[in-house]
Amino acid sequence: MKRSTILGIGSYLPKKIVTNDELALTVETSDEWIVKRTGIKQRHIAENNEMTSDMAANAARLALTDACVHKDDIGLIIVATTTPDRTFPSCATIVQDKLECKNAFAFDIQAVCSGFVYAISIADNFIKSGQVNTALVIGAEIMSRILDWQDRSTCVLFGDGAGAVVLGNNSEKDSGIISTILHSDGAFCDLLYTTGGTAYNGHAGTICMNGTIVFEHAIEKLSASILEILDQNDLEINDVDWFVLHQANIRIIELVARRLKIPYEKMVVSVNWHGNTSAASIPLALSYAKSSGKLKKHDIAILAAIGGGFTWGTCLVRI
């Protein structure tokens, strides 16, 4: 059976860094308050002339180099983003042009913080069906442009960045994307949303969130979806080498680990240094895990994310 495997990983963070102390100069907060509640110490912010497609292309180039794959071999580009350059054309087609991937078709996927897991699942199925052999899956966000910088409940949480993986066709039984599970429930759409929209009022708007309730749902749904994918594949917690959760808040990661009795050293944590980058957070965490020597060939990892909608999902992969 055909199976897609991760051939390469790349990431990009803007040069500009905003620390908690710098935020405290403009909004009522402190480094101690932010770190205690979120674990976040800093976030990267895109320059005014930097677009989501720029960051996506930068991460994709590094992923292609890591995979030793030529741009002409890419058959599909999916960009998971909530903050595209424009309403249309898609960010993915702009990235396609920047990368000169002439043989690919490209489109965006919007599932907010779950976007990368959704995109991985879609690309995996294109490869399994034989429609493409190699795909670029990118998560890229400029969340700083949809923040109310006077709202300390949200502006301290988010950052900008991009991460990418190259997926390729692989018939090896012991590697690749083993399975994915996706969920959504629109009944919760008013708990995490933006105040704007193209049809709604013609403006991008800013993020609004019922933090306490979202926090509770995140722990519950991430925990349940991890157990679901383990059960589907007859695996136990101890069979998994790494748990790569959406990097929204270190307390969510800690509480999921505690609830499922996952040894904390198996949790990949990078939120401290880039904040919540929405669809970019999981590929950024994967890139960190690989570059730091944690993630190795044949390791089993679970990717798990939850985002506005609500949308949530998991991916079981052997590297």
From Swiss-Prot:
It is an enzyme of class 2 (transferase). It is found in: Cytoplasm. It catalyses: malonyl-[ACP] + acetyl-CoA + H(+) = 3-oxobutanoyl-[ACP] + CO2 + CoA. GO terms for biological process: fatty acid biosynthetic process; secondary metabolite biosynthetic process. GO terms for cellular component: cytoplasm. GO terms for molecular function: 3-oxoacyl-[acyl-carrier-protein] synthase activity; beta-ketoacyl-acyl-carrier-protein synthase III activity. Its EC number is 2.3.1.180. Coiled coil: none annotated. The active site is at C113, H246, N276. Pathway: Lipid metabolism; fatty acid biosynthesis. Keywords: Acyltransferase, Cytoplasm, Fatty acid biosynthesis, Fatty acid metabolism, Lipid biosynthesis, Lipid metabolism, Multifunctional enzyme, Transferase. It comes from the Bacteria. Pfam families: ACP_syn_III, ACP_syn_III_C. InterPro entries: ACP_syn_III_C, ACP_syn_III_N, FabH, Thiolase-like. Belongs to the thiolase-like superfamily. FabH family. HAMAP family: FabH. Homodimer. Catalyzes the condensation reaction of fatty acid synthesis by the addition to an acyl acceptor of two carbons from malonyl-ACP. Catalyzes the first condensation reaction which initiates fatty acid synthesis and may therefore play a role in governing the total rate of fatty acid production. Possesses both acetoacetyl-ACP synthase and acetyl transacylase activities. Its substrate specificity determines the biosynthesis of branched-chain and/or straight-chain of fatty acids. This is Beta-ketoacyl-[acyl-carrier-protein] synthase III. The gene is fabH.
